[in-house]
């Protein structure tokens, strides 16, 4: 049986590990290092360089060197090299191909299967893009696993049978995740996860670069941001300074011949950066990790004191300020020092590959979906079918109905996010279920099923229960979340909670009013057209007509109070109409079962049908 590897495809560095005799081993690359820079360069002679060789020549080949491409996964970002546009998947595939080659060289055999990790907070498009990168690299991706989950798997397998609660704080080069997991008796279960897909060591580097640019401009009057080669040298110096400040109180940044002045005289950059100054200019970045941490504790429903172990993952957690913050937030608990933050994710991925290949027994990995999933229903409401932090794989179904009479098709629009109003969430994709037989609104039953596989990738099916006709979409080719979208997604849900609740209530009231008007209008029409004429006086029907007209007028406006008032009045008149019919029927001594049972004429819908309607949306979504 072919071997499977575990790969941590990182923003700044990547790692590959494999099981040897049941134990995970991190594979050194062809340069002898256990981590490979996630950098790809296209040399002028046509050669493609990957890893450390690509990083080494970046200063002299700035425009043709690509780094931190993970931040663009799942988006429509491309980079043009020699008139060819490269997608993030293609660039990532180059890194994966190198890791694959290095592992094959180590094992002496071909490798086709891999488990690849992603940040827990990656959305569907980003996960799909990662899987595609693996396929481009010639790998059969057995599973996409969340990085904190892989880390917990690597950390917790040898910790005995006792159930433990573990907090994984994962701050890498470009992404941040925090997850709470329970481990015991071979089961690794994720309780909650949160994060920020655009927060990582790169941001700390950028702050040092900005600081150096400002310092140099202050002394020489020259703006280095206009010089690409100088900026590349600053970036490399900033990364080196950041690493040095993890063990030293200050560091010297010395860059000779950084640029020239107006008279072509060479200029030197020589600055001293202290740890205190570094922490001051990056304090706001550090503070951005607090909210996801608090969110995870809240979602898991536990107290900070219930955490048994804290595991730090990602090279950026080596910064003393990060370690101190984690210690502060966990009530003084010392983070575990027994894992290598650069390698633990790849080790966990290799273990999961072993589980899937049958090499590792009695281990069950239960992961969760990081964001809620649902569809847009009438009134622009987000009707959630799967809530965030639901264990995956999972499958959920709900039945919806049509919004208009004789509606021939429904547009199913799939969203991911936490806001009550669908448009405020991330549109993952849409598809149409056609061929619905002509029927009054509320009669067709459309069953919508969400199926999330173990990779966190979404499949959606819509089925007309009446005809058995169905349509399925596998959500892919997403545009990815922009930085603004990913940062705002959950915090917007909290900031706008009241506004969203109000919008949802308004949509619900409007839906109820429209439904009551429709059903009552239909019933009045049936009474007037009944054989032998209506059983109730015309003035009773006229009162109902008047109430219907008032309700329609209210619905044409935006005053929810007026709609509620008109709905109450219509309800009263509808009840009076039902009572009059009942009394007339009793007087005629007719069999009162069928006619009397539908006194208000407004309850023909199936009780199993969810009280929400799929919107027939002809307008192009912006």
UniProtKB/Swiss-Prot annotation:
**Keywords per UniProt:** ATP-binding, Chaperone, Nucleotide-binding, Phosphoprotein, Stress response
Which InterPro entries did the record assign? ATPase_NBD (IPR043129), Chaperone_DnaK (IPR012725), Heat_shock_70_CS (IPR018181), HSP70_C_sf (IPR029048), HSP70_peptide-bd_sf (IPR029047), Hsp_70_fam (IPR013126)
Q: Name one GO molecular function term.
A: ATP-dependent protein folding chaperone
Among PROSITE patterns, the record links this protein to: HSP70_1, HSP70_2, HSP70_3
Sequence ranges of Acidic residues compositional bias: 608-622
Instruction: Supply the CDD domains for this chain.
Output: ASKHA_NBD_HSP70_DnaK-like
Induction behaviour = By stress conditions e.g. heat shock.
| Chain intervals for the UniProt region annotation (Disordered) | 588-622
Q: What does this protein do?
A: Acts as a chaperone.
Record's protein name: Chaperone protein DnaK
Organism of origin is: Mycolicibacterium vanbaalenii (strain DSM 7251 / JCM 13017 / BCRC 16820 / KCTC 9966 / NRRL B-24157 / PYR-1) (Mycobacterium vanbaalenii)
